[in-house]
Design a protein with these regions (language model features):
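Pyridoxal 5′-phosphate
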Residues: 1-282
């Protein structure tokens, strides 16, 4: 069974989870945030809705998109599994990380016979991958140290992630509304922000947009010629089809800056967007 996206928000509503989950449903898998619309799911509401129907249901979340943008409390939310990818926040490709709850850790699985039942590791991992991930954590803790006098690494990490989220929300607002030097996406003729919502507290720093009468691939190429990197997400891709069509589109241009971008970077992107919209309108 597949839960359908809300075309107005680009997310999955708890009510939709109630529709597809029953007392015999074993597993619910849900993305923490959409990598196309940037919508952060109401995970508390989704978990609560599922467990009201089946208290024993296993719930896992794909947090590849959301993990680099805000802290997650897996214990509070009651997840049984979480996965994320270090390449999304300056780490190495070729490796992913996961979390499993105590009850999942003890499920039957392939393991070295003499190891404890909750150990899933097989063989020797690549030290370089862990070194790269450790450097990411060091960086976030360094950021957190600018906003607190705490020395505990977990507290530093949480503060760092919270400020990353706030910084990105400010950049998202700038993209949408602009500055006195560059008009925002909401105010450029011929430009459309898809699945746009006023409440930015439930959005990661991602915008799905389009320009009137312009092929997505052609538009991406024109951005690249001007030094701006964006990507097309179209329904011909198996990775994009469900959510793109779920919000009533055939494709969108995905714009996804990060906290380290500046207001000046956003202004340059907005100026290029306005320039392209005017050129294509001729």
């Amino acid at each position: 069974r597949v839960a359908q996206a809300n075309p107005k928000t680009g997310g999955i509503d708890p009510e939709e989870i109630r529709r597809v989950v029953d007392k015999d449903t074993c597993l619910l898998s849900v993305m923490y945030a959409s990598n196309i619309t940037g919508t952060i799911m109401d995970m508390e509401g989704i978990v609560r809705a599922a467990r009201e129907i089946n208290p024993d249901i296993y719930i896992v979340t794909d947090a590849v998109q959301h993990a680099p943008h805000a802290p997650m409390d897996v214990d509070k939310l009651g997840f049984d599994g979480v996965n994320f990818a270090p390449y999304k926040f300056f780490g190495t490709r070729g490796m992913g990380y996961g979390y499993v709850s105590d009850r999942v850790a003890k499920l039957p699985h392939r393991k070295v016979l003499q190891r404890p039942e909750e150990i899933w590791e097989l063989g020797s991992p690549t030290p370089g991958n862990f070194a790269a991930m450790s450097a990411v954590v060091d960086y976030v803790c360094w950021l957190g140290g600018h906003f607190t006098k705490e020395t505990d690494r977990r507290k530093l990490f949480l503060v760092g992630m919270e400020h990353i989220h706030l910084q990105e929300r400010a950049l998202l607002y700038t993209m949408l509304e602009g500055t006195d030097k560059a008009a925002g996406l909401r105010h450029i003729p011929g430009v459309h922000v898809y699945v746009d919502t006023e409440d930015l507290t439930h959005r990661d720093l991602i915008v799905a947009m389009g320009i009137d009468d312009v092929d997505m691939t052609k538009c991406v190429e024109e951005y690249q010629k001007r030094g701006v990197t964006v990507f097309e997400r179209v329904n011909s891709s198996v990775y994009s089809k469900r959510i793109v069509e779920g919000v009533g589109l055939t494709g969108a241009i995905r714009v996804s800056p990060m906290h380290c971008h500046t207001v000046e970077d956003i202004e340059e992107y907005l100026r290029v967007t306005k320039e392209l919209a005017e050129e294509f309108a001729k």
